[in-house]
A protein has these predicted regions:
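Bacterial N-terminal signal peptides that target proteins for export
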Residues: 1-9
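Bacterial N-terminal signal peptides
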Residues: 8-18
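Noncatalytic, solvent-exposed loop/strand surfaces
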Residues: 21-445
Length: 445
């Protein structure tokens, strides 16, 4: 074989391999917010418009209740759900009366926490597996569910997490439980929220209750705890201001190494994912509790949004170097910020929608505002970026599409029968959305 032919074949093989890798990435949505946990989808053909009778390939009812997002691999789509045995109105009133600060809470008599699998092609139910049965569960907030954490799908295993009720690994082919870890218990006050993050063999999970606050790594192979690190930052003395519901972000940096970026109450922390050693922490200031949005990162900065009472957005240097004021915080802003939806970082712009429907675009390097506009609805689900556009999914069931640019431009609006609490997923050129009652496959017809 001559050198020129070898070069041509090598280039062709490189293109084929690159295409194959990209196809696998596009075809799977293995965790909360996608392959890179950033809300970005590679598809260029997701529809701009749909309704119950337009661009819906299938629609199937999901048993029980849950806010976990769909995760996808091959022909399988998995969600978690809680099938509740309701209390009577008098029983619920009596149970809640015994709880301090029970405003906004609701409670079930018992719950069956389940992993449910559907065919990506047809929407047919493939598995419905009880993972955990709980009698007399803790109360949850009316905006939460007992199955809010999104599972992780990897190499034929599904890793489901339910906060204080445990973590379970499932064989996706047989539907059999491989292991269960039920040793981590916290008082969430409002129910579970943090999804697991994965780093090599470690499932990294935040446990931030009103009684104890720590981060743990569970071995994905056997379910044993590898490390557990207590939060070190000083917090508000009131226990209800010590809780959090945030998922950790994993940063892989060839120069700086791997980090777990883990928001807790009043502080955002960085940990070594192998050992759990704290690397650095940065303060939000006071009342930085109940944090929900998953951090996003890029250009040496990680963006963290705290949640209730006094929302604050911080751009933190994740290499541990100090900014001009001697802190790790490059810039920060207060005011109208997302309390539940996560943000999108697209090149040098940071996009988000607040719970009350205020959309914003900022310069990610400086925090300066490009635009701020009201969009329809209330929001809990995190936005999606695909093909130059941002999709916003409201609790009322409306999806607003805007261009990802420094000027605000609304492109489309669509509505389905149910509301969105779960964030979307994409596989191939299809969009998968979970409403409060159904799972949909949406694609161009």
């Amino acid at each position: 074989m001559n050198q020129q032919l070898a070069i041509c074949l090598g280039a062709a093989l490189s293109i084929v391999m690159s295409t194959a890798v990209k196809s696998r990435a596009v075809d799977e949505w293995p965790q909360f917010r996608g392959p890179q946990a950033d809300g970005h989808a590679d598809s260029t053909k997701i529809p701009l418009n749909w309704r119950e009778t337009e661009n819906v390939a299938w629609k199937t009812e999901v048993p029980g209740t849950g806010h976990s997002s769909p995760v996808i691999s091959g022909d399988q789509i998995w969600v978690t759900s809680a099938v509740e045995v309701k209390l009577s109105a008098d029983e619920e009133k009596e149970r809640l009366a015994a709880i301090k600060n029970s405003r906004g809470l609701e409670i079930a008599g018992s719950i069956s926490l389940r992993a449910i699998c559907f065919s990506r092609t047809s929407g047919k139910l493939l598995h419905d597996i009880e993972l955990v049965k709980v009698d007399e569960p803790e109360p949850i907030h009316s905006l939460n569910s007992y199955a809010s954490p999104t599972p992780i799908l990897e190499n034929g295993r599904l890793y489901c997490h339910f906060g204080t009720y445990g973590t379970v690994a499932v064989d996706t082919k047989s539907g059999k439980i491989i292991w269960t870890n039920a040793e981590h218990h916290v008082d969430h006050q409002n129910g579970p929220g943090a999804s697991p993050a994965i780093w090599r063999n470690n499932l990294v999970i935040n446990f931030d209750g009103i009684d104890t606050q720590y981060v743990a790594a569970i071995d994905k192979r056997d379910g044993k705890t590898i490390w557990q690190t207590k939060r070190s930052g000083k917090m508000n003395e009131r226990v209800e201001f010590q809780k959090c519901y945030c998922t950790s972000a994993i940063i892989e940096d060839k120069d700086r190494g791997s980090q777990v970026i883990s928001p807790g109450a009043d502080w955002v922390y960085s940990y070594d994912p192998a050992s759990g050693k704290e690397l650095w922490k940065a303060s939000y200031g006071t009342l930085g509790f109940s944090t929900v949005p998953l951090p996003v990162f890029g250009n040496g900065l990680v963006f963290v949004s705290t949640s209730f009472i006094r929302p604050r957005l911080l751009a933190v240097r994740y290499d541990g170097t100090e900014a001009k004021d001697g802190s790790l915080v490059e810039w920060q802003m207060d005011g109208q910020l997302p309390q539940k939806p996560s943000m999108l970082l697209i090149d040098d712009e940071l996009y988000f929608v607040t719970d009350k429907g205020i959309g914003m675009c900022l310069d990610a390097r400086t925090g300066s505002e490009h635009w701020k506009e009201r969009v329809e609805g209330n929001y809990s689900a995190s936005p999606l970026y695909a093909n130059g556009r941002i999709y916003l999914f409201s609790q009322e069931g409306t999806t607003v599409v805007v261009n990802a640019s420094k000027q605000f431009e609304k492109v489309a609006e669509s509505t389905l029968d149910g509301g969105f609490m779960a964030s979307p997923a994409v596989a191939g050129d299809a969009l998968f959305v979970r409403t409060d009652t159904h799972l949909y496959r949406i694609e161009e017809k």
